[in-house]
Amino acid sequence: MSKPAVKSVQSATAKTATRAVNIRQKVKAPKQAKPEAKGRVRPSKDKPRVEIKKALHPRNAHLNGYDFPALISAFPQLKTFVRPTPYGALSVDFADPLAVKTLNAALLKHHYGIGSWNIPEGALCPPIPGRVDYVHYVADLLAEGDKSCAMDKARVLDIGTGANGIYPILGCQVYGWQYVASDINAHSLTNVQSIIEQNPVLQGRISLRLQPDDKAVFKGVIQAEERFELTLCNPPFHASMAEASEGTKRKVNNLQLNRGSSVKAAPKLNFGGQAAELWCQGGERQFLATMIRESQMFADQCLWFTSLVSKQENLKPCYQALAQLNVDTVKTIEMQQGNKITRVLAWSFQSAAKRKLWRAEHLAN
C-alpha cells in the first residue's frame, strides 16, 4: 500500500496583532513558498516535515500578550488577582486556580463575547491563547488558501470537549462554525450545556453528545450520513491517575520555583483536570492509535481529522499507523506558546482535488 503524501502548512507572518477577533473571520490565503534550490533533496515521504511556529498564529488576538486594563474593564472581578511583576508588567498568579479561571472568563468576555463562563472545581482550565491557536491553524488547513471558503458553513466535531467547552466556544465565536461536542462524562456535558444556555450567541450552534463507550473515539458519536469538515481533539495526556498527579505536582513546582518560592503543600495545578480529561488507559499514544484506526471508518464523512499531540515521541507511531491506511495527506504543525511546545497532527483520506470539490459543494459563499 502506498504511503501518504506529506505536506506542510504555510501561513503568513503578521506584522501586528489584531486587538480583537471578529466573528466569522475571513481566512487569508497563505503566501506561496519559495521554490527549492536545485539539487536540494526533498524530505522522504516516510519522514514528515514538521513546520515550527515560534509565535502565536498571526490572527491570534493574544499575539501581544494580555491587555490587563482592558480585561479588567470588561470583567472587573479580575482586578482582585492582578499584580505587578518584579519587571513592572501586570500579571496573575498562574499557580492559583481561581486567578486563572477568572482570567479565562475575562478573556472570553473581552475578546469573544462570552458573558458567562464557569467550570466546576477541579475541571481542566485551558490556556486560551494556545487553544485558539489550534483553531486558527485548522481553519487555515480547511481553507487551503481558498478565499471563497465560507467558514460559517463548516461543521466541526470536538472529541472530549470537557467541562469547559473551549473549542466549540472559540470556533463558534471566531469563525461561526457549527459544532458537535462529545465527551464520556455526562457531568462535563451538563456544565457545557449551562454555558450555552447562559450565552445566547452560542445557542443553536453547539450540539452535545455523550460517548457511551469510553474506549471509542468516533464510534457512537458520528452518525450515519453525517458530514464534518474538521474534527478536533486534545487527547488525555497521561496513562494513569498516578502519572497525572505527578505531572500536576511537577508543573506547580516549576511555577513556584520561577517565583522563587517552594511548594509547602500538595498543590493544585492551574489547569486542573478531571480523570477523563487528564488520563486514559495507554495514555496519549493509545488514544491517538484508536483515533487513527477509527478514522478510516469515517473516511468519507470527515474532510480533515486533527488532534493535538503533546509528546513528540508519539508522532512516529502515528505516522506509521497512518501509512498503513489509505490516507492521502498528512500534515504536522509544531506550535510554541511560551516555553510549551505542542503539535497539531492532521490527516485526510481525500485527495487535494476531492477536498476542493468538497469545499465547493459544502462551503461555497
UniProtKB/Swiss-Prot annotation:
GO biological process, any: rRNA base methylation
Enzyme Commission number(s) of this protein: 2.1.1.181
Entries under InterPro entries matching the protein: METTL16/RlmF, rRNA_lsu_MeTfrase_F, SAM-dependent_MTases_sf
Subcellular location: Cytoplasm
Catalytic reactions on record: adenosine(1618) in 23S rRNA + S-adenosyl-L-methionine = N(6)-methyladenosine(1618) in 23S rRNA + S-adenosyl-L-homocysteine + H(+)
Pfam families in alphabetical order: Methyltransf_10
GO molecular function annotations of the record: 23S rRNA (adenine(1618)-N(6))-methyltransferase activity
Biased composition (Basic and acidic residues): 33-49
Region of interest: Disordered: 1-49
Broadest EC class assigned to this enzyme: transferase
Alphabetical keyword list: Cytoplasm, Methyltransferase, rRNA processing, S-adenosyl-L-methionine, Transferase
Function: Specifically methylates the adenine in position 1618 of 23S rRNA.
Recorded family membership: Belongs to the methyltransferase superfamily. METTL16/RlmF family.
Protein name according to UniProt: Ribosomal RNA large subunit methyltransferase F
Species per Swiss-Prot/TrEMBL record: Shewanella baltica (strain OS185)
